[in-house]
Amino acid sequence: MKKFFETIKNIFKIEELRKRLGYTLLLVIIYRLGCFVVLPGIDATMLAKLQSATSQGLVGLLNMFSGGAMGNASIFALGVMPYISASIVVQLLGMFVPYFRKLQTEGESGRQKMNQITRYLTILIICIQGPAYIASLHSQIPAQAFVAVNALGWSNFTYNMVATVIIMAGSLFVMWLGERITDRGIGNGISLLIMIGIVARLPYALIAEFGEKFNTTTSGGALFFVVELLIWFFVIVAAVALVQAVRRVPVQYAKRVVGNRQYGGVRQYIPLKINAAGVMPIIFAQALMLFPILFSRWDATRGLAATLGNYTGFWYNFIFFVLIIIFTYFYTAVTINPTQMAEDMKRNGGFIPGVKPGKKTVEYLDNIMSKVTLPGSIFLGIIAILPAFAILLGVNNQFASFFGGTSLLILVGVILDTLQQIESYLLMRHYDGLMKTGRLSGRSGM
């Protein structure tokens, strides 16, 4: 533990790292303040119905990603979701469209072009989602809440146009904040803003769960709450294991003599991640499962759509689980290219001991990926459906979302990624890092 705190002190001894952390903190504070700035012309005291509607289900998940801005009718209500949607679309285009696939191989210039395309697509998505969100406000909050319409005599059309422009500008500003953090701060800015939004909802969820369990008329509420926290801790540990787990494939490099120096002759490893797809399979699966939820609202007979639309029901979670496994294999197959890996290995004079270069190496890597993807996809599916089980066992909806799913994996993934970036700065300045073989180095002293 002493070593861990010494490492924390070392962080502030590095001027560049200190400035980057300060810059990141400043922009995060600006983002969080903006999440509480209500759209002009709306009475903030009349948002109870909107906050209730955005506290559960898929909308609740989106509200969590925005840090509660969606439920506050904030100028940052759309948050970074338009940018995330655009990034996913561009990423998919890079898998199937030759032009985008070519851009991915052009290094920094190709990356800049793809970033520019992502920005343009973000603006297009904002132009669609902005008016849709303003229209949803009219159905979620009472007409008296629109002060600009009632007191100033504005028409609904005029107010909607002004509010839409403000919402769109707010979302573009959030995108800019994320890019500034990436360039001049620490971590991936967009991911960090999502993580901050999720963390910001955690105290509210804990307070709500604490209140329910301690105000219950039945005995054992306090004990149940403690058990919940213990289970939650083990789920977090499992999520960390899923994000960090890799299968190391040994690679031997042949010796080369250039001039008077000898190169190669060392053994390295290719780290094949157990969950190479990250949270993308959950996002794709949730996008598909949104359709039965939407159709169930108009299904008066409570038939098939209503059955599949029950996100705590058996069939919803069974199909959700199967879709995650399918999408994990699909996304891993299109993002991990064994042929390219084998060619790069051969070009650099490397080979896998006991495996012939070329086709045999491709088959070996493909076989390894298939084997490690199966347990990874099943584990990912289990974590994704844990919130539904938590709700069925009596956990509050808000707190249940932290028991697994996209929010927990994003939380764990972004924190680990940020720690690894800080680690690289420390190691470059010859300080002990925060992490050691994927674990916090300070643990060894506990």
Language model feature labels by segment:
Residues M1-Q104, S109-M446:
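N-terminal cationic and glycine-rich segments that engage phosphates or anionic surfaces
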